[in-house]
Each structure stands twice: as structure tokens, then as C-alpha cells.
Amino acid sequence: MSLNFPLLLVIAVAVCGLLALLDLVFFAPRRRSAIASYQGSVSQPDAVVIEKLNKEPLLVEYGKSFFPVLFIVLVLRSFLVEPFQIPSGSMKPTLDVGDFILVNKFSYGIRLPVIDKKVIEVGDPQRGDVMVFRYPSDPNVNYIKRVVGLPGDVVRYTSDKRLFINGESVAEKLLGAEPNTLGSAELYQEKLGAVEHEIRKEMSRYRAMPDGQWKVPAGHYFMMGDNRDNSNDSRYWDDPNIPKDLLGMVPDENIVGKAFAVWMSWPEPKLSHLPNFSRVGLIK
């Protein structure tokens, strides 16, 4: 069972906030009253006794201490920026296994934590954006891919690995063989909308499926990995519980945010590597 960290964070903030509120309206007045009664009953109040009477319950003390920290984390993570780690090579060469990235949570609208309901419109995904989203077949799993098809687009990917959007071939330019692959993989520069980025194709690997064509419904997006022959993306998703016309599509409510930067890398296996900052930079 996957850990629902946003839900746990909201619960932690709520519990700590409740403890702080209870102290404000109930425990603190009782402490002040006890101190006043004690001071009125003796001619020379003992500072040690006053300190003991004014001591907060341990649970309240922890709650009040953690509340501001957890609240700030909740606001930052839910509405501004959230960190993620790249678990696979499906976005090579743009992102590699072990990259730690930052995701802008407000680029595509302000959403409430846990329920992910959009409450403030800000903007929509654009073709070429690198986007984190919840996998349609298992919303507890986050995926990261590049936005290829927008609502209303017709996307076609051919058996010879060419991409077409609305009948027009997407521009790409061969950059050369990928280093350390003995020529088995090539890198291309592709332009999606206003975004120029690199993609990877394996020359020795043939697609197991024929030409595919998809019509992107309203409120949905078609996603592909930059590592075109090693990416579980909109081209391949299949789920009997999802209507046929929505197979491969990411609904707007599943959007997490826009990936915009790599801030650290820690290659696998982590026990034999150290974190490094060689790949730090903005994501194209």
C-alpha cells in the first residue's frame, strides 16, 4: 500500500493546530488562573512553583512547536513547489534516474491538497511542458512525461518513430549517436510548440505495435516520454476500467504540476554513489 503523504501532512497540521487551539482557549487560561490563585495565597511566591504551574502539557508543547513548521511545509508543498525523484529512464536524456526535481504546483491552477480540486485558474499545460501527473489507472502513483497532445489534438505516432500532431510532422533534427551506446541509440532535437528539447531513439529496437492515432478529448492530455522506445506512456496504457476513447489520456484533475528544475542527482545504486550537482539546471 502506497503512503499518502499529502493526507498524512494535512492530518498532522490539523492535529497540531487543534492542540495549539485547545491550549489557547482552555489550558492556558487554567494555567494563568492557577498561578493567580497561588500568588494570592502566599506572601512570597516561589518562582519554581510558578514555573511548574505555567508548564504546558507535553503533547501541547510538541503540537505548538511543530505546527508552524508543518503548516509552512504544507503550504509550500501544496501550492508552490514540491520535490520529486526520478525513478526511471523514460525521460532520458532530459531527466535521468536519480535526478531530484522541483515541480511548480501553481502553473496549472491552485488545487486543494488531498482532494486535488482546482479552486483558482492560473494556466493550462502547453505542448512541450514536462509535467508530473497521477497515473490514470492508479492515482497513487506519480508519472512524469512531456505534454504532446492538447485537448482537441489528433496525435499520430508511426512505426518508423515519427510524430505527427494534427496532420503535421513534428520537426526533429538528428544530433548524432548517444555516447557509450556503440551507435545503438541516437539523439534528436525535437520542437514541440515553442519548446526545443532532446529525445532518444533506439535504432535496434522496433515498435511492437503498428501506427497509432489518438484524438485527445476535452480536458485531457496526451503524454510521451523523451526516451521514445523505453517509456510507458499514453501510447501503451490499457485499462479495462477506462472508456476506450479515454485510454492513454491524462485528465486535468490528475495534474500535479510542471517540472522546471533539477536541483540534485543521486545515481543508483545509492550505496556506491554520492549525491552530486552536475545535472543542476532548468528543465527544457
UniProtKB/Swiss-Prot annotation:
Catalytic activity: Cleavage of hydrophobic, N-terminal signal or leader sequences from secreted and periplasmic proteins
Keywords tagged on the record: Cell inner membrane, Cell membrane, Hydrolase, Membrane, Protease, Transmembrane, Transmembrane helix
Listed PANTHER family: CHLOROPLAST PROCESSING PEPTIDASE, SIGNAL PEPTIDASE I
Protein name in the entry: Signal peptidase I
Lineage of origin: Bacteria, Pseudomonadati, Pseudomonadota, Gammaproteobacteria, Pseudomonadales
Compartmental location: Cell inner membrane
Gene encoding the protein: lepB
Gene3D superfamilies assigned: Umud Fragment, subunit A
Primary localization: membrane
Record organism: Pseudomonas fluorescens
EC class (word): hydrolase
Entry similarity comment: Belongs to the peptidase S26 family.
NCBIfam families in UniProt: sigpep_I_bact
